[in-house]
Amino acid sequence: VNIIAVGVLPATRRNIVRSSNQTEDESSDRQAWNANYGLMRLKDFVDGFIIVDNQRISFQTNMEAMYLSYNDYIATCIADLVSGLFLERIDPRQYPELNPPVIDMNDIMTALSFDHKGRGKEPGFASIGRASAITCDLLNYILPLSKNKKIDTLMLARLAAKKQSISNINLNECEKNLALIRAPAKYLKKSEISINTKGIEEFMVKNSKLNECHLGVSLTKRNLVSLTTLFTFEKEQIPRLNEVINLARSYEDKSKNLANIES
């Protein structure tokens, strides 16, 4: 059984604005320790990690109010990757004229893990992101007369890169990645509105040190073209993970010192 773990990194707000509340800082360190402990314990049992970083919403005035929409965004990204066709009950056999590249769970697992010589298979740490664009004007829902829009897929790729789930991520450090385009059938046929899959593939390969990109195209019944991406890194290549690890070690050292004093 293949296992993908979704790991959540706590927001460490004192790196943005220094906290005047020592209890808040200690709570942040403790959350970092919990997150690091969970990730390291799971590392030997999972095939890959998708990292969700709460630092991404920590800049908001009311961070707690953002959790619901942030969770919905992450859930939509994951659902698009693993069950988009099933959720919309689309049978690709109904479109025999289309033969798009397909992504399955094997591709996702390959994109999320590393096979190191001498060390065997190890989980990677991935950031996930999604961008979408509507294919017609609002008026078209009432009077379906206007033409469908041509979608700037390169713009979608850049937007998805900006909406990654890990804060301060450097895509130039990415080892491998995956991209799934979902579009109505008419956008997969050769025409003036057909999507530019080549441009997306070039963008993704450019942001892969291994030149490894898993590209797939899937159908949707919605008037929407979406791009969902995974960028996979080694643990050491993610600054936020290293920051959480350092905070966890600091908390552990403080706890040991406090225990020694009390004893």
Predicted regions and their residues:
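Tubulin/FtsZ superfamily GTPase core signature
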Residues: 1-263
